[in-house]
From Swiss-Prot:
Gene designation: mutM
Function: Involved in base excision repair of DNA damaged by oxidation or by mutagenic agents. Acts as a DNA glycosylase that recognizes and removes damaged bases. Has a preference for oxidized purines, such as 7,8-dihydro-8-oxoguanine (8-oxoG). Has AP (apurinic/apyrimidinic) lyase activity and introduces nicks in the DNA strand. Cleaves the DNA backbone by beta-delta elimination to generate a single-strand break at the site of the removed base with both 3'- and 5'-phosphates.
Reactions accelerated catalytically: Hydrolysis of DNA containing ring-opened 7-methylguanine residues, releasing 2,6-diamino-4-hydroxy-5-(N-methyl)formamidopyrimidine; 2'-deoxyribonucleotide-(2'-deoxyribose 5'-phosphate)-2'-deoxyribonucleotide-DNA = a 3'-end 2'-deoxyribonucleotide-(2,3-dehydro-2,3-deoxyribose 5'-phosphate)-DNA + a 5'-end 5'-phospho-2'-deoxyribonucleoside-DNA + H(+)
Native organism: Acidithiobacillus ferrooxidans (strain ATCC 23270 / DSM 14882 / CIP 104768 / NCIMB 8455)
Protein name: Formamidopyrimidine-DNA glycosylase
Residues holding DNA: H91, R110, R151
Amino acid sequence: MPELPEVEVTRLGIAPHLRGRRLEGAVVRDSRLRLPVNDDLAARVSGQRLLNLRRRGKYLLLDLERGTILIHLGMSGHLRVLPQSAPVQKHDHVDLLFADDLCLRFHDPRRFGAVLWLDDADHHPLLQHLGPEPLGDVFGAEYLYQRGRNRQIPVKSFLMDAHIVVGVGNIYANESLFAAGIDPRRPAGRIALPRYMKLVQAVRTVLEAAIAQGGTTLRDFTRPDGGNGYFRLSLAVYGREGEPCTHCGAPLQGVRIGGRATIYCSQCQR
């Protein structure tokens, strides 16, 4: 599933081509996504100028003059900026049509994504209860320490809770906990403030590196230019169960936490 870095890479890739342009409408070939596409999407966006493209967690938000288009890439979605006349491929479900023969095309084979019209994005149920951004100022060691006090939930599940912090999915939770030397099974309430300081720095370092390298392509994700993300070449633990730890050489261990594959080093992570 595309996580924060992949959504940010997408935003950075499409923003220069579309910001400030006027929409001419939309083509919805299949509205049956995880959340159905609005029946009146074309009418709502037609004639409006795209003022800004921003990201909130794993959501991409296209702010128009009146209202916002929310896009979630789901498990397998990606976006491309193309000529409106570009051949339509299987699973090209939605086109947002812009002036000068451009379109933003949403491709989603597994249809777990979303393209929604929001009248008031900041107060929409999908967004209003989200935690802070991991690359923002609110996200810090003291914040995590206070939110984790007396909680027995494994720190990996705690870190992946979008009400605590947004956008840290399975890949980057694994990598951040390894970088911080914290056992993913450890209860969130049993981590001291200095260790949370290491974790916050690790999360930021890992996410920033992933964005710089174009995200992580494991199967479905491609950048808006059609290329792959190369952070997968830097993965220290994710997908490496049984292989030697890059720090100590011990075999990496695998366990499921919250139903998600979790890889860690029993020697380096405590």
